[in-house]
C-alpha cells in the first residue's frame, strides 16, 4: 500500500531564521523542515514584517485584494528557508513596524485587527498560489486561531478547502488573543457581536478560543501539557473549552535542533566533546574552566550550576530567590544569564555582589554564553511555574548537564528523576511550587556530586544519549495529520 504524501500549510506569526521572539519560532522552522525531509509537501505562511519585506530575496509574487476589508490590497512575498517555500503576507498598514507585537513593552493597539487580517488573508491567498489543495492547515497559538473558525464558517462550501482539515498547536495558553468585538469587526462574521465559538463575554472574544472550538484537532507541545490544559490552573481559565475537545486533544513533545545544540559540532564552546565518558569529562572540564574565566569566578573544581532564562515568575525565579543565599553557603558556583523583570534583576545583582566568589549574574541574553553555560555546567536549574514544553532541559542533557526541573508540562515528560529511577535517570525533579522543595532537590544534587562524582558522570553520559530529534516528533505529527484527515 502506497502511503499518501501530505500537503501541509504551516501558519505561524514567526519563524526562526527569519524573525523570532520565542519558542514558537523554533518549532515553525524545525517541524516543517522535518516534515519535508520525511517526504511531505510543506509551505509556510507568515506576516511580512518590516525586516522580512526588506530582504533582497523576498520577491513579490502576488498583489491582490482581500474582499470586505477596509484595507483591501496586500502583497505576498516569496522566500525560502531550509528549502521550504515561505509566503509572507505584506500590508504596510499592519506589518511595516519596528517590532512584531509590541514596542516599549506596549502591545500594538490594533493587534486584534492585524492578526484577524493575517488569518483572512492566509485563506484568501492559498487558492491563488497553490496548485495542490492542502490536506492540513496547521496553525499556531492565538495569532492564527481565527483560521479554523473561518474554514468552518466562511469557507465551509468552498471547493478548494472542501477536504482540508485544520490543526491548532498550543504553545502557551496564557496568551489567548482577547480583543473587543469592535477591534476585529472588519471580519463580517464578528460585526453582530455574537460569535459563540469565540466569545468570552458580551463585549470580548478570544482568538485562541475560536481556534480551540473550531480546529479539527488540537495539539499541545508536550503530553503532560495536554493534561494540564484540562485543568483551570494549567489552561489559565480555559479548562471547559479544552474539556469539550478532550477527545481531539493530543500532546506531542517538541524536538531539539541538534544542528545547533550538539557538543560534538558546537562552534561556540571552547572545547567540543563526544558522547563517551573520556571525551565528555575532558570537554566539560575545559568548558567549565572557560566559563569561570568568562564570568570572573575562581578557577575551582566545584559543582557548577547554570540557569539561562527570561527573568519572569513563569521561569520560577520566585522559588529560587528566597533560598538562593542559603544555597550559596555551600561549596559550589552558580551562573545565571537572562533579562526581564527589573525587580528580579536588581535582587539577583545584589546577591551576586555579596557572593562574587560563587555567583555570577549576567543581565543579558548572549547566545554564545548560553552555549557556554550549557556545556560548562554540571547542573541546569529550571524550577518553572509552568512550562508547556521547554527546550533548555533538552539542550542540557545533550551537553551532559543534568537538569533540575519542576514536574510541569514538558519538563515532566522529558526528564527522568534520579530519585525515582536511578538506572534511567537524566536529572532531578521536584513537584510542588515551593522554595524549600527546590532547595531540597538542589542539595540532593550537590550531595551526590560531593559524595559520588563517578555516579554523576554516569548519569551525565546517560543524559547525553537521549534522543529528542525533530524527525521523531514529526512522525507523530504525521500520524496525527492522517488521523485528522480520516476522521
UniProtKB/Swiss-Prot annotation:
<comment type="pathway">
    <text>Glycan biosynthesis; glycogen biosynthesis.</text>
</comment>
<dbReference type="GO" id="GO:0005978">
    <property type="term" value="P:glycogen biosynthetic process"/>
</dbReference>
<dbReference type="GO" id="GO:0004373">
    <property type="term" value="F:alpha-1,4-glucan glucosyltransferase (UDP-glucose donor) activity"/>
</dbReference>
<keyword id="KW-0808">Transferase</keyword>
<dbReference type="InterPro" id="IPR001296">
    <property type="entry name" value="Glyco_trans_1"/>
</dbReference>
<dbReference type="GO" id="GO:0009011">
    <property type="term" value="F:alpha-1,4-glucan glucosyltransferase (ADP-glucose donor) activity"/>
</dbReference>
<protein>
    <recommendedName>
        <fullName>Glycogen synthase</fullName>
        <ecNumber>2.4.1.21</ecNumber>
    </recommendedName>
</protein>
<comment type="function">
    <text>Synthesizes alpha-1,4-glucan chains using ADP-glucose.</text>
</comment>
<dbReference type="InterPro" id="IPR011835">
    <property type="entry name" value="GS/SS"/>
</dbReference>
<comment type="similarity">
    <text>Belongs to the glycosyltransferase 1 family. Bacterial/plant glycogen synthase subfamily.</text>
</comment>
<keyword id="KW-0320">Glycogen biosynthesis</keyword>
<dbReference type="GO" id="GO:0005829">
    <property type="term" value="C:cytosol"/>
</dbReference>
<dbReference type="Pfam" id="PF08323">
    <property type="entry name" value="Glyco_transf_5"/>
</dbReference>
<feature type="binding site">
    <location>
        <position position="20"/>
    </location>
    <ligand>
        <name>ADP-alpha-D-glucose</name>
    </ligand>
</feature>
<keyword id="KW-0328">Glycosyltransferase</keyword>
<dbReference type="Pfam" id="PF00534">
    <property type="entry name" value="Glycos_transf_1"/>
</dbReference>
<dbReference type="InterPro" id="IPR013534">
    <property type="entry name" value="Starch_synth_cat_dom"/>
</dbReference>
Amino acid at each position: 500500500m502506497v502511503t499518501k504524501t501530505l500537503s501541509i500549510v504551516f501558519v505561524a506569526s514567526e519563524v526562526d531564521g527569519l524573525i523570532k521572539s520565542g519558542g514558537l519560532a523554533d518549532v515553525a522552522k524545525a517541524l516543517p523542515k522535518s516534515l519535508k525531509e520525511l517526504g511531505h509537501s510543506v509551505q509556510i505562511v507568515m506576516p511580512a514584517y518590516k525586516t522580512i519585506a526588506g530582504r533582497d530575496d523576498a520577491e513579490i509574487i502576488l498583489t491582490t485584494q482581500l474582499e470586505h476589508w477596509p484595507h483591501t490590497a496586500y502583497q505576498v512575498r516569496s522566500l525560502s528557508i531550509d528549502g521550504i517555500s515561505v509566503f509572507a503576507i505584506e500590508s504596510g498598514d499592519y506589518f511595516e513596524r519596528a517590532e512584531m507585537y509590541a514596542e516599549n513593552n506596549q502591545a500594538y493597539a490594533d493587534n486584534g485587527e492585524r492578526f484577524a487580517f493575517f488569518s483572512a488573508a492566509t485563506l484568501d491567498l492559498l487558492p491563488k498560489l497553490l496548485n495542490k489543495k492542502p490536506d492540513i492547515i496547521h496553525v499556531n497559538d492565538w495569532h492564527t486561531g481565527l483560521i479554523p473558525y473561518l474554514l468552518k464558517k466562511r469557507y465551509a462550501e468552498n471547493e478548494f478547502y472542501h477536504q482540508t482539515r485544520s490543526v491548532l498547536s498550543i504553545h502557551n495558553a496564557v496568551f489567548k488573543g482577547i480583543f473587543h468585538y469592535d477591534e476585529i469587526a472588519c471580519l463580517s462574521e464578528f460585526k453582530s457581536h455574537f460569535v459563540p465559538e469565540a466569545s468570552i463575554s458580551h463585549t470580548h472574544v478570544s482568538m485562541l478560543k475560536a481556534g480551540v472550538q473550531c480546529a479539527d484537532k488540537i495539539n499541545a507541545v508536550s503530553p503532560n501539557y495536554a493534561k494540564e490544559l484540562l485543568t483551570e490552573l494549567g489552561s489559565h481559565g480555559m479548562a471547559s473549552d479544552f474539556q469539550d475537545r478532550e477527545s481531539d486533544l493530543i500532546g506531542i513533545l517538541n524536538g531539539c535542533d541538534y544542528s545547533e545544540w550538539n557538543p560534538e559540532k558546537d562552534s561556540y564552546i571552547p572545547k567540543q566533546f563526544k558522547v563517551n565518558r573520556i571525551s565528555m569529562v575532558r570537554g566539560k572540564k575545559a568548558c567549565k574552566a572557560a566559563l569561570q574565566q568568562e564570568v570572573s569566578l575562581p578557577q575551582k573544581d566545584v559543582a557548577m550550576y547554570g540557569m539561562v532564562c527570561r527573568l519572569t515568575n513563569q521561569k520560577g525565579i520566585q522559588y529560587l530567590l528566597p533560598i538562593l543565599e542559603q544555597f550559596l553557603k555551600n561549596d559550589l558556583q552558580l551562573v545565571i544569564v537572562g533579562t526581564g523583570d527589573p525587580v528580579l534583576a536588581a535582587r539577583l545583582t545584589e546577591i551576586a555582589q555579596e557572593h562574587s566568589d560563587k555567583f555570577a549574574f549576567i543581565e543579558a541574553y548572549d547566545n554564545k554564553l548560553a552555549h557556554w553555560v550549557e556545556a560548562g555546567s554540571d547542573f541546569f536549574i529550571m524550577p518553572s511555574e509552568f512550562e508547556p514544553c521547554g527546550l533548555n532541559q533538552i539542550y542540557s542533557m545533550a551537553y551532559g548537564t543534568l537538569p533540575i526541573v519542576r514536574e510541569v508540562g514538558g519538563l515532566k515528560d522529558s526528564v527522568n528523576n534520579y530519585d525515582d529511577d536511578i538506572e534511567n535517570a537524566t536529572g532531578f525533579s521536584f513537584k510542588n511550587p515551593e522554595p524549600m522543595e527546590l532547595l531540597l532537590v538542589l542539595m540532593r544534587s550537590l550531595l551526590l556530586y560531593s559524595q559520588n562524582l563517578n555516579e554523576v558522570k554516569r548519569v551525565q553520559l546517560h543524559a547525553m544519549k537521549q534522543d529528542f530529534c525533530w524527525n521523531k516528533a514529526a512522525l507523530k505529527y504525521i500520524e496525527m495529520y492522517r488521523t485528522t484527515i480520516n476522521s
